[in-house]
């Protein structure tokens, strides 16, 4: 039963798919890619009571076990998406009814840098296959300058706007697209720089329900190279700001190019070598994933064939029984009449 005075969870928009609903814990998390979403999904899965180890069996080209949390949502058994909850039952899902409805955002400069590294620079197999021939696809770097130049080329090409496939990729869409700040009535939208505030609020929320617990927060999907000032020089930072101005308008009260957090002034030679290792490892992961998926597809076909043949055998058996039983019955009747 809902109270008409409660703010509805949605403001006239379709229920989005990037949502994780925990009815017993009165939590609704709206996930945003490249904003601690791997760690936050593990946290949500643990609170919800999902079988965490079951995620490891996915066959996609995930770089680590922790990345398997991104396998298809059909694998989640206890954490529905908002659209899976009938409209008639969504009334109680409201910040005014004690629900914690939240999303997390980050400045667009570090987010794009993170997305470019994890998908392109380390050569994620899917992205190599789909975009490897594009002019803006980065080379395997030999130096810091290679990385800086290739990121600049990517930014100025703006393929998340011009490429029809990347245009649909949520890793490179605005955060506004995922968060829908005007369409969802949030308890709060948190900044990645202030995650401790989110965790404190989650603990307080769970404690109020008598369900407080330790939060499972594995650190995952770290980018091999931290953001350094050189990455945003030469007009790159300004170009990113222009492209993602919508996010700055909606969330960026404390964001500005001169406040972007960087770490160090340069990368060591070892850091570049470590990055090179990532590209080689991802290539091999892609090989193994492809073989595994092909084997799984062949197994499904074999199982379908077995089921089909089993059905045909049963039909033949039924026909044979229908043919033989009357004969046997007639023969027995003749014997009885003698």
Where are these regions (language model features)?
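Helical coiled-coil/dimerization "stalks"
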Residues: 301-338
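Membrane-interface amphipathic segments in extracytoplasmic regions
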Residues: 1-315
């Amino acid at each position: 039963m809902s109270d008409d005075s409660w703010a509805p969870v949605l403001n006239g928009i379709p229920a989005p798919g990037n949502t994780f609903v925990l009815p017993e814990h009165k939590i609704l998390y709206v996930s945003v890619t490249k904003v601690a979403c791997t760690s936050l999904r593990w946290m949500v899965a643990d609170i919800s009571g999902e079988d965490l180890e079951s995620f490891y069996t996915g066959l996609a080209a995930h770089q680590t076990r922790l990345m398997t949390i991104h396998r298809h949502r059909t694998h989640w058994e206890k954490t529905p998406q908002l659209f899976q909850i009938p409209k008639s039952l969504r009334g109680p899902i409201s910040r005014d009814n004690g629900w914690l409805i939240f999303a997390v955002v980050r400045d667009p400069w570090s987010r794009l840098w993170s997305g470019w590294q994890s998908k392109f620079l380390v050569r994620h197999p899917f992205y190599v296959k789909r975009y490897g021939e594009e002019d803006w696809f980065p080379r395997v770097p030999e130096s810091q300058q290679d990385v800086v130049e290739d990121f600049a080329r990517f930014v100025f090409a703006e393929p998340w706007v011009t490429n029809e496939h990347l245009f649909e990729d949520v890793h490179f869409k605005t955060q506004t697209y995922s968060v829908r700040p005007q369409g969802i009535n949030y308890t709060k939208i948190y900044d990645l720089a202030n995650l401790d505030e989110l965790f404190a609020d989650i603990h307080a929320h769970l404690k109020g329900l008598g369900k407080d617990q330790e939060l499972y927060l594995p650190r995952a999907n770290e980018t091999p190279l931290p953001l350094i000032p050189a990455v945003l020089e030469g007009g790159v930072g300004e170009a990113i700001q222009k492209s993602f101005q919508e996010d700055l308008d909606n969330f960026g009260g404390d964001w500005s190019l001169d406040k972007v957090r960087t770490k160090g002034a340069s990368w060591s030679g070892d850091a570049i070598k470590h990055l090179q290792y990532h590209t080689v490892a991802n290539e091999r992961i892609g090989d193994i994933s492809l073989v595994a998926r092909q084997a799984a597809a062949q197994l499904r076909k074999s199982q379908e064939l077995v089921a089909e043949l089993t059905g045909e055998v049963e039909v033949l058996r039924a026909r044979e029984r229908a043919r033989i039983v009357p004969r046997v019955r007639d023969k027995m009747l003749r014997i009885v009449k003698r």
